[in-house]
Amino acid sequence: MARPRAFDEAEVLEAAVDCFWSQGYEATSVRDLAAEMGITGASLYNAFGDKRALYELAFDRYVRAGVHDRIARLEDLPPLEAIETFFAEVVENARADPARKGCFLVNATLELAPHDPEFRGHVMDVLDAMQAFFRRQVEKGRALGVVTRSGAADEVAGMLLGQLLGLRVLSRVDPSPERLNGMLRPLFALLRAPPQGDGTAPP
């Protein structure tokens, strides 16, 4: 009969997220992980497999809380508010990150995804989910007449995703709200539909 685990799996996985997030995949050793998680190396292997398997679990945990839960929470807001709140939370997270760890997703995209086809697929699934969220908000905003009709909805969503990733990279160098919000103001201005009666032809 298998012995019950002598640790809280959610708690130690969160510790693994913090360890990988702070140091990256390559620089993090199994010894580092075991020390951060408060378990032995043997317990780590028995519970989670090797370092690569644990990294994927940590990545999935981060994505669930940092991306999918946020999308679900913002989905039913008015479309412009949903988009702006998504970005505002990213700016706030950057401001509250004195270690300048950046975004685990972006870090993984740069470090592992180019060299690991399987993991690249996981990253693309997350990026696609974010772009789909932005596309839904653009389409809803156009139906309400509050989002510009310039450009295909998926291309506008791709622009928003690109700006988001750039914002997260820049935040590792300069997370000041002044700089980050300064990047976003013209983006949001481009996103808004022109006022009615300005001579713009209807769609």
Question: What is each PLM-predicted segment?
Answer:
Residues E11, C19-A53, L57:
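Helix-turn-helix
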